[in-house]
Amino acid sequence: DHPEWRGKPLIVGGDADSRGVVSTCSYEARRFGVHSAMASAEARRLCPKAIWTHGHFDRYREVSAQVMAILADETPRVERVSIDEAFIDITPGRFAPEDPLLVARRISDRVAGLGVTCSIGVGCNKTVAKIASERDKPFGLTIVRPGTEQRFLAALPVSAMSGIGRSAEERLRRMRIYTLGELSRAPESTLASIFGVNGERMRQRAQGLEISEVTSLDEEREVKSVSNERTFAKDLTERGDIEAAIALLGESVGRRLRRQGLTGATVTLKLKYSYGSGRTAQRRLPHPTDDENIFVAVALELLDNIWQDGMHVRLAGIGMSDFDHQGGIQTDLFLSLIHI
């Protein structure tokens, strides 16, 4: 949202004059020693020329939803960990037909198109993928091929592995275990005496042998709707631009419908305007479909119901619903537009 801030020290947090705390900061600010949870007054002392701003959490959630939807375009198996982190399963022949590196590059390019950075790690399990994603932030893409996990992990400090905090790291240091390679070779009995049943799991993870599945929150629930929306950096005012945006969003919805084996009978078009309010329009189709050529054409007809010349469109969305499921629990899958 502020391209003029790029490359400059930026701090997000409370005011330094009111006992505020740093929520996060740019990499440029981190070079001065600033970090999250630091007192704002201390951060200002370390980096007096930093740009300060308060958190805009509605915007963060909006962009997060756009990123998660990009992931959902690639695979139905998306496990969201936090607002800015997710695991996805792109195992060739299982959920994705291409080499994982090609998929990862495409995701990276699409996320960059949103104006945000992402770092991607690709591996055979969550531990390896997460550590790989930390390698070259903020634009990194690191792939660890099958069979190379131990070599990749061996020289890294034990703190590189999630779940090993300061307390566990200190106990490992007392055992003269400093790297993941050393942890992978530690006797099982020794680790069990200190960490109990978690000791063996720690060792397996350090060996790169963890078995972990990506689990979607909606995996065993019935999908109620599949939708895609986008907030525009600049309001759309021309009908042609609005129609093009709806068509592009519809292509993504169509791909996801086909990937999940769904056909929908109701089309929903959603617009939000520059002054904050919004409207939706719906139409039921004579037959369920997963073909965007069909439901996008209907959405464009619905445009006349909720838009007129002169209206400034800030957000557009298109969705399909009314799927024919048998049993299950219904939940919305309204993904508007990663471990990333």
PLM segments and residue spans:
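Aromatic, loop-rich ligand-recognition surfaces of beta-strand-rich domains
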Residues: 322
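Gly/Gly-Pro- and Ser/Thr-rich, intrinsically disordered tail segments characteristic of DNA damage-repair
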Residues: 1-204, 217, 255, 330, ...
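Short Gly/Ser/Thr- and Asp/Glu-enriched loop/turn motifs at secondary-structure junctions
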Residues: 81-85, 123-126, 262-266, 311-315
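Short glycine-enriched, charge-decorated loop/helix-capping segments at active-site entrances
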Residues: 28, 284-286, 334
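DNA-contacting surface of Y-family translesion DNA polymerases
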Residues: 160, 168, 173-313, 325-329
